[in-house]
Amino acid sequence: QSKYYGIQVVVGEATQKQVDGFAFLELDLICVLGKQKPELVFGLLGGSELLQQPHFTTLLENHHRMLSHYRHQEWEEAMAELESCRLVSREVMGCPALSGLYLLYQQRIEEFVKTPPGPGWDGVYFAESK
């Protein structure tokens, strides 16, 4: 999944919770091929030095708001937060490029604006491959 998100290291929620002192960013709520239950996945972006940067804290807050709007089908708000994330992520020293991740969400949002997922959608992305 790392290639899909443009992040070198992608881990599940259980792994993310067991590791302290590293900078993680929630990437998606995903249901992989062959599984029934969706799982939160996270990208490992760096170590403790990244966690201590004020811009990284701002990025986490903006990213969380973007995902919340996305999962509530608030497309305009999600897109606005996405743009904020793009800007802030460039200010975070030592943070890997997140342009691929935000392009992915931009494309999903644009598609959902054209073809809404429906009122029962819970924000889960169904991966077509493992």
Where in the sequence are the language-model features?
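Cytosolic regulatory/linker segments at or just downstream of nucleotide-handling modules
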Residues: 2-77, 81-114, 118
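Intrinsically disordered, low-complexity, charge-biased linker/tail regions
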Residues: 117-130
